[in-house]
Amino acid sequence: MALRFPRFSQGLAQDPTTRRIWFGIATAHDFESHDDITEERLYQNIFASHFGQLAIIFLWTSGNLFHVAWQGNFETWVQDPLHVRPIAHAIWDPHFGQPAVEAFTRGGALGPVNIAYSGVYQWWYTIGLRTNEDLYTGALFLLFLSALSLIGGWLHLQPKWKPRVSWFKNAESRLNHHLSGLFGVSSLAWTGHLVHVAIPASRGESVRWNNFLNVLPHPQGLGPLFTGQWNLYAQNPDSSSHLFGTSQGSGTAILTLLGGFHPQTQSLWLTDMAHHHLAIAILFLIAGHMYRTNFGIGHSIKDLLEAHIPPGGRLGRGHKGLYDTINNSIHFQLGLALASLGVITSLVAQHMYSLPAYAFIAQDFTTQAALYTHHQYIAGFIMTGAFAHGAIFFIRDYNPEQNEDNVLARMLDHKEAIISHLSWASLFLGFHTLGLYVHNDVMLAFGTPEKQILIEPIFAQWIQSAHGKTSYGFDVLLSSTSGPAFNAGRSIWLPGWLNAINENSNSLFLTIGPGDFLVHHAIALGLHTTTLILVKGALDARGSKLMPDKKDFGYSFPCDGPGRGGTCDISAWDAFYLAVFWMLNTIGWVTFYWHWKHITLWQGNVSQFNESSTYLMGWLRDYLWLNSSQLINGYNPFGMNSLSVWAWMFLFGHLVWATGFMFLISWRGYWQELIETLAWAHERTPLANLIRWKDKPVALSIVQARLVGLAHFSVGYIFTYAAFLIASTSGKFG
């Protein structure tokens, strides 16, 4: 018999229905479940796929550089970053009529183009790129790296080059390479680039391959480094009148601690950032050399974990057994990696707007909004993934004997306390926050706005004051001119920092009031509820009150009716599925809040946010409805405009989102009957019945339909909000 898809599962390949195709796609990457898989092949497959992932990333970034160099306006933009709109790439569309061609021809282009809202122009400009030739060079180099990665992936699947399992489980060597090699050396290399290329470029000096060996990054060269006079590198920094990209007002310092922002670009000082990366490099280079590898010195992770005895015996056997549990479970490792990466991605979103690193990006409002939203959504998906793999760990890899009475076992032992506390926190936040919003809503509706319950966030204001914000009048820590912390930092970074935090032209420590207090608690509700569902799904993955032993049922067993006691909504996958809806919901509130507050800030009418954000109708009317006017007006009797594409995307996003419900709210029997009817009609229709199929068509399983519904819901939701965000922001600020 000829081999049928999927080749990795002969059992599935013999399935006579269309289930074969869908289950095949669903389990294609679940290497552990494939026929004849060994631990060694599992690790090698994953290792090789990492090279493929890198190849795709390099190819993609290369494509960004190439298209901007070919079809963009980088060189024109560099001359006037505040007024020229950066072009991402040209649009070729045979359906465009004259009005469309005119609407999308902008940024000094000859034909229709897409405007870039990704911030790449600002990024490339900041790191010292200036010409299209620079961009082409970068694109070629990344293409080369991409090819190298593909070769690397192929090579490590060849018998001679296949790493052994012991190599994959050598935790100390991996830490050494990742901490020192990946983070340490690359941070050091980046410091080198900033000092040798980016900082000179910001002062109007071009350093390229032809002259980098004879241009001194600092007048004193390496002298101060070897004589220990490191402070010389910080002397004579760029002045506050420095024009970025020119020598006017520039200094000679390369590693500084100025604090605050460059007055013209509104971004962090390049010399501060070089200093930061150097410090990070040294930290990680040291950290990577703390663990015992081939040389018999340094710490053994296993010894560290075994030796740690919790005080007073309150955590049982502490970390005993954890080393082998984690080191032998790729799901546990992936869960930890995803949790870390998710948090970092969310931190990137928060810091990219509050402490902008790239020149002029703070004045490109649409890009700021797009980047914040983009990183928060990605963080949400990554974080939910961490819990999904945590749950799979408990089902596939957790061994109770190996972890007796250690911190992991104790988490499981008191999971009911954890889950009930989270549940209580969610209920408390939900009822109180909604209660306040609804009360305020009713007061506004009855024409008595003065009867709203408005709570000042005094603790958060106190924290802002402690960091130096003076407008609240708290006079504490850095906002108190007589304090020791204030005096200690006054000669170094404080003047720049205090200047930045008390200026209204940036997003550092925005002034907050009752509207912020309410939406903060709405977001807290979303975070706690999402966490509740995810934590319960992971901790109950092996067994729960209703179903004490789920081990052999696996991660995503389906809803099986009441016949055998009922298994609806109690697989770990079901918890993940529900959590994603809550995650999207929460990020909706986060991005609505960020965007509305910033729109009013940028337009100079911040009182609109302050007054309208304390009741639900304010959010619906003054944020969503008011800002969607551009989207509802993309096509009208007068033709079209440059926002029309977003108007269509807004509609299309709603369509995709609504399609999700077709999969989420329906019975399998209905679809099965429909499929049978269509198949029957097809087989009895002349000409049509010439086309036959081998697999009997069957309706999607419950789990599959939920996945397809969730995918449509998520994609539609994000498409809709992306169009809203970009159109409403670019429509106002150009």
From Swiss-Prot:
Cellular component aspect of the GO annotation: chloroplast thylakoid membrane; photosystem I
Catalytic activity: reduced [plastocyanin] + hnu + oxidized [2Fe-2S]-[ferredoxin] = oxidized [plastocyanin] + reduced [2Fe-2S]-[ferredoxin]
GO biological process: photosynthesis
Enzyme Commission identifier(s): 1.97.1.12
Membrane topology: Multi-pass membrane protein
UniProt GO molecular function: 4 iron, 4 sulfur cluster binding; chlorophyll binding; electron transfer activity; magnesium ion binding; oxidoreductase activity
Sites where the protein binds [4Fe-4S] cluster: 559, 568
Subcellular location field: Plastid, Chloroplast thylakoid membrane
TM spans (from-to): 46-69, 135-158, 175-199, 273-291, 330-353, 369-395, 417-439, 517-535, 575-596, 643-665, 707-727
Protein name per its UniProtKB record: Photosystem I P700 chlorophyll a apoprotein A2
Organism: Olimarabidopsis pumila (Dwarf rocket)
Gene label: psaB
